[in-house]
Amino acid sequence: MGNDSMKTIAVIALCALPLTLATQALAQKSASPGDVDRGRYLVRIGGCNDCHTAAYPEKAGAIPEAEWLTGVPVGFQGPWGTTYPANLRLAMNAMTEAQWMANARKPMKPPMPWFALRDMTDADVRAIYRYVKSLGPAGKPAPTYVPPGGNVTTQFIVFVPQAPPAAPR
C-alpha cells in the first residue's frame, strides 16, 4: 500500500470515529423494552413502592402502576429529623441518566436504604431509571426535609424504638 492509501484510510478512520462513538452513546441511552421490564421488576422486588407509593403496603401492592412512585406526604421522623419519600417520577424526570447514576449511590437520609442502590450493578440502577422515566412525570413534589426540632406540618411516623410499658405491680 502506498503512502497516499494509508493517509486516506487514516482520514476515513478518524472521520468515522466520532460517528461510531455517537452511535454507541445513543444506543446506551435508549431504553430497550428489556431495560424497562427489568426496572419494573427491580422496583417491585426492591420495595421501592413500599415507601414511594401511597397505600401500597396497606393494599398489598394492589395499586395501579400509573400511581406508582409518586411519593407520600407522610414523613419518617427520627434523630435525623423528618424525611419524606420522594416523588421519584418527578425527581427522575428532572435528571439525566448520568445524574441519576451518580446520585443513586450517594448516602441519603434514613430510612431510605440507599446502600441497596449502592450495591446494585450499573445495569440494574440504569434499568430502574429507565423504567421510572418511562412512566412519565406525575403527582406532586414531596414535602421538604425538616431538621431535628423543626416544625413538622404533616403526618409522620416516629422511627425511634420505644421502651415497653412498665408491667403492672
Model-inferred region functions:
Residues 2-13:
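Bacterial N-terminal signal peptides that target proteins for export
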Residues 81-96:
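Peptidoglycan-targeting cell-wall enzymes and recognition modules
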Residues 21-27:
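Sec/Tat signal peptide C-region and signal peptidase I cleavage site
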Residues 37-41, 49, 86, 98, ...:
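Solvent-exposed, polar/charged alpha-helical surfaces in well-ordered, non-transmembrane soluble domains
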Residues 11-21:
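Bacterial N-terminal signal peptides
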Residues 31-34, 45, 53-83, 114-169:
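Flexible coil segments in periplasmic/lumen-exposed cytochrome c-class electron-transfer proteins
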Residues 89-93, 102-104, 114-116:
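A structural feature that tracks compact, well-ordered secondary-structure segments
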